[in-house]
C-alpha cells in the first residue's frame, strides 16, 4: 500500500509542476469539508487535495487546470444556446448534493433519446448535481467530474450537452478511469489526450 501511495504522489508531482499548483487544503480542512458534505473523497484525489494542491492552473482539463475542491467553473451557471442542445438540464446556481449517489453506471447519450422532458429531466439533473465533485472544464458545456458517491465512486466522468460518459474504455476496469490514471493519461498524452 505504501508503494502505491508513493507512486501516486510521484506521478502527481511530476504531472503538475509546483508553479501551477494552488496551496494544498491540508488534512484538517479537508476532513472538515468532507464532514460538511457528508462524503469521504476517493483516493488518491483526497491525498492530492490535502497534501499536493487544491487546484492547479494547468493540467487536465485543458481549460484552466483543476478546480479547487467544491468550486464550479463560471460556465456552470451560464446557458449559451450554441453550447446546449438539450433543455436546461439543471439549476446551475443551486447547491450540488454530493452525498446522493451519482445516478449513472454507463454512458448515456440523451441527445438521441431526449423525447420526453418529464422522463429525462430528473435523471439529467441528478447526473449534473448528485454524487460528484467538479474537476474542471474543457470548454463551456463540457465538464470533468469525479464520482464520490454510488457504484461509480472513484471514477472520472465527462459531462457535456447530450452525453455523459465514464473516462476509460472499459466500465469493468474502474482503476483505468480513476483520478490518477486520468491525470497520467493527460501528462503522457495518451487516452483522451492522444494527439490525433
Predicted segments, located by residue:
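Intrinsically disordered, low-complexity regulatory segments enriched
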Residues: 81-84, 89, 113-115, 149, ...
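A surface-exposed partner-binding patch
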Residues: 1-137
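Basic, Gly/Ser/Thr-rich N-terminal segments that form RNA-phosphate-binding interfaces in CRISPR RAMP
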Residues: 69-70, 150-151, 180, 194
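Segments surrounding the PLD/"HKD" phosphodiesterase catalytic module and close analogs
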Residues: 143-177
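Long, compositionally biased interface segments
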Residues: 166-196
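Short, glycine-/Ser/Thr-/acidic-enriched flexible segments
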Residues: 140
